[in-house]
């Protein structure tokens, strides 16, 4: 049996394809790829042992996300930022780095009259010429910035809630903006 590393999103996809409890990762991949065990190796292992998927599989990601956000809050880089907009942008960039797929889903919310996040500047300008769109560093996303600190805090709170962060870290992060 060989061990391979896979991205979190690929792992979740493979795990979601489990048909019965105890099904190994090798069995799932063989089924998904339509590969017989005979073609895989010349001398197949007697009993393939792979990952066992549990309902808590995604829990580790949240712990890593919480650690990353706590590290951000105590970092010299974050402490050195003097204005709310810079802290806001760094928080959004960090959330994207933690889990880009969840971030993408979490940023789909809209206000009554405004779109807050988009993948291009024009979409944000279309919801108001005074939105002051800015690119979120190291992401393909743009965000409106012409709003008060309270609105920025609400935006971050919404994203973090949708990404599944616990309320205590959400509160710490939003109050740090």
From Swiss-Prot:
It comes from the Bacteria. One of its GO terms (molecular function) is DNA binding. One of its GO terms (cellular component) is cytoplasm. It holds the Pfam family SeqA_N. Homodimer. Polymerizes to form helical filaments. This is Negative modulator of initiation of replication. InterPro entries: Arc_rbn_hlx_hlx, Ribbon_hlx_hlx, SeqA, SeqA_DNA-bd_C, SeqA_DNA-bd_C_sf, SeqA_N. It is found in: Cytoplasm.
